[in-house]
Amino acid sequence: MCIRDRLGSYRFQTFGEYSAVLSTFNIEARQIRGEFKGEPYTGIIYSATDDSGKVVSPPFKSSRFGKRFGNERLEKRMLSHTRDFKDGKWAPTIHAQVVYAMRHARSREELTGLLKKASIDAVFRENEQGRIYGVTFIDHNRREVFNGSRMGKEFSANIYNELFKWWDGIPATERSAHTGTELWQHHSHKAEPGSALEQAARIFSMETNPVDYGEEALARRMKKRRKAKRKSRGV
């Protein structure tokens, strides 16, 4: 389990995003909390997994790989990445590729396959009932990691939860007889106003009318910074 080589220079802002990128290399990272000499501490342990995410090795303490992979150094790294993100030094650039995959796929498997062709991994987190409550995208070309909600509400977990259920509800014979785009043309009008499926259908206009999500996100962050400065000056 060569974690030093795998992590490289990926940028992420939360431990969840960090563990998501490692999971694509069959590595599980878990935080452990406890108390030592009356003081609380947080540590990280790493394990190897198989392709289904099942742990197949004993856990290894972060100290085995060096301080860089311990909780203290990781917290500093995430803080630095978050600061740079807020300053507009990096931002998601994969919106168009994700939208293309959503529009042209006919199943969850096809969606992840199309993303992989663009060197993008999607990690979905599900509860015991199978409901998706989180999604993280890993852009391996730029080595950047984003929770779906950070890319925009159109890429949040709820969208994919409803999208996958919608795909599964279409008869297999119909799915195999049509492209993903044709399925949307045949069925998207049935989506209830304000539903997650309607939101998904709206973003498909990106293919003909691209939206610069990175520019929009930067504008929102700069607006927040200006408001914060005015508050600090008592304006």
Predicted regions and their residues:
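Extended intrinsically disordered terminal tails
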Residues: 3-235
